[in-house]
């Protein structure tokens, strides 16, 4: 008979084992780090490291518009897309573009903008991939409890099954097509736009009639020529905003149409409140900075290369995909900003799923598998529905699993670290705060790793 395995390595302590603060609140979010695997002394040393490295100074430089994307010689000013401060970089330019997008969205919602025969628009097809799709889709899905008189359908990859499913039952005379691509060179987007154009043409929607059914969102000023639409049907992006950070601007036009500009403004407002908090809070009390520091610790000290995101709320199902792209495209790199090779781990592999469903699929692996995992468990205190008993069970599951996922047999050397994120009420405002919090975590991790989180050379190589 084989004897049980014995390991010399004891389980690491939890942050909660010390006397310091382990949870912080901001902008309707409560973030609890108590189940992460480090001591209060470890955390204090990490804070000192961040301060010595100039973490907050680097963050301030980004927000103020300095060239932080060194490889492309650009600023990274996604925060300007939601800023309410007239002194922020490009404020007037952003406001002008937003006002124009808002006016268009409201004209579609009110029925003032109609199809070529005078029919009101009932459906929007968003053609885009990556940052031009997953951000708006995450916002749209998270807002499923709000009135959505106009439906949005997201067409991303070149899978004809997806295309057929979207077009089935749609009336082309009541459909608006939004073609979104920062460069307007993304093959999947251009191919899909061509096929949908054929669908419109088959209904007789060509020439000037087509102008009532197709708009574009791009940083390429010639995109309207390529798409054969009037220049006034082109809405701008800028090269100082990366695609995965762009949901706050014109890329969000489908959400503006579906949800209304008042709702979209609340979304921007929540993000701006988080921006102000993160800008001002010291590292030791800054939830984005602490998320980044603990992720850095997990990756470089504990060799935890996996990050699992587990929302216990259907509305945040697509948020997992958004966070996956944000983190892996930003931090999946092996060289520093100066071109030298990084020795050791950088960004983690991000995956996850709806927490309640995942309990019956991969939680077995999380609990007893041979890989260490860092876990973000997200829940909402107020339900997005009227079924109180269902919500009570869901929240009980989330709280119990937060503890179960860090409970291990002491004879095993593998372990998890769990951060719980509790949202008081998932509204457009707190959704904006949540997404901005993660954005700041990622850009700060770029500083900690010494890499550029704003370029994507691997993606560009793949396009070739």
Predicted regions and their residues:
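Extended, charge-enriched "interface" segments that sit outside catalytic cores
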Residues: 2-117, 391-399, 403, 423
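Ser/Thr-glycine-rich phosphate-binding loops at phosphate-binding pockets of nucleotides
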Residues: 17, 127-133, 181-186
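Gly-rich Lys/Arg/Thr-decorated short loops/hinges at beta-loop-alpha junctions or inter-strand turns
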Residues: 79-90, 144-150, 341-343
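Glycine-rich oxoanion-binding loops at beta->alpha junctions
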Residues: 90-114, 139-141, 145-176
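A short, charged/proline- and glycine-enriched loop
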Residues: 118-122, 302-305
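A short, small-residue-rich loop immediately preceding and capping a beta-strand
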Residues: 122-127, 176-180
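Glycine-rich, small/polar surface segments that engage phosphate groups of diverse ligands
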Residues: 125-148, 357
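A SIS-like phosphosugar-recognition module
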Residues: 146, 159, 167-464
């Amino acid at each position: 008979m084989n004897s049980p395995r014995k390991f010399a390595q004891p389980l690491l302590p939890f942050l909660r084992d010390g006397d310091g603060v382990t949870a912080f609140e901001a902008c309707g979010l409560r973030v609890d780090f108590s189940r992460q695997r480090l001591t209060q002394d470890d955390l204090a040393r990490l804070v000192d490291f961040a301060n010595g490295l100039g973490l907050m100074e680097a963050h301030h430089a980004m927000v103020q518009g300095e060239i932080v994307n060194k490889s492309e010689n650009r600023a990274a000013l996604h925060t300007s897309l939601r800023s309410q401060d007239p002194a922020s970089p490009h404020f007037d330019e952003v406001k002008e573009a937003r006002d124009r997008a808002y006016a268009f969205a409201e004209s579609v919602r009110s029925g003032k903008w109609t199809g070529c025969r005078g029919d009101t628009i009932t459906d929007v097809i968003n053609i885009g991939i990556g940052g031009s799709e997953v951000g708006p889709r995450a916002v749209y899905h998270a807002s499923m409890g709000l009135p959505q008189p106009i439906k949005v359908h997201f067409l991303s990859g070149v899978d004809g099954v997806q295309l057929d499913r979207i077009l089935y039952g749609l009336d082309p005379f009541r459909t608006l097509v939004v073609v979104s691509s920062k460069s307007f060179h993304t093959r999947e987007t251009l191919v899909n736009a061509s096929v949908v154009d054929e669908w419109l043409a088959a209904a007789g929607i060509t020439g000037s009639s087509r102008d009532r059914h197709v708009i574009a969102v791009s940083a390429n000023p010639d995109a309207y020529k390529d798409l054969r639409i009037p220049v006034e049907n082109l809405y701008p992006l800028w090269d100082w905003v990366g695609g995965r950070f762009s949901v706050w601007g014109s890329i969000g036009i489908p959400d503006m149409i579906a949800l209304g500009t008042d709702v979209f403004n609340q979304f921007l407002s929540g993000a701006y409140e988080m921006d102000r908090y993160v800008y001002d809070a010291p590292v030791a009390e800054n939830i984005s900075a602490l998320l980044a520091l603990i992720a850095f610790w997990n990756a470089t000290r504990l060799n935890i290369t996996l990050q699992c995101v587990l929302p216990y709320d259907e509305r945040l199902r697509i948020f997992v995909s958004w966070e996956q792209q944000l983190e892996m495209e930003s931090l999946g790199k092996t060289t520093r900003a100066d071109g030298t090779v990084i020795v050791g781990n950088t960004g983690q592999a991000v995956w996850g799923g709806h927490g309640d469903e995942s309990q019956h699929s991969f939680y077995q692996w999380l609990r007893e598998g041979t890989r260490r995992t860092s876990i973000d468990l997200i829940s909402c205190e107020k339900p997005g529905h009227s079924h109180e008993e269902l919500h009570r069970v869901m929240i009980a599951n989330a709280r119990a699993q937060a503890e179960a996922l860090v409970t291990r047999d002491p004879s095993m050397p593998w372990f998890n670290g769990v951060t719980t994120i509790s949202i008081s009420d998932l509204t457009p405002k707190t959704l904006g705060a949540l997404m901005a919090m993660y954005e700041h975590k990622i850009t700060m991790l770029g500083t900690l790793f010494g890499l550029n989180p704003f370029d994507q050379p691997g993606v560009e190589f793949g396009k070739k």
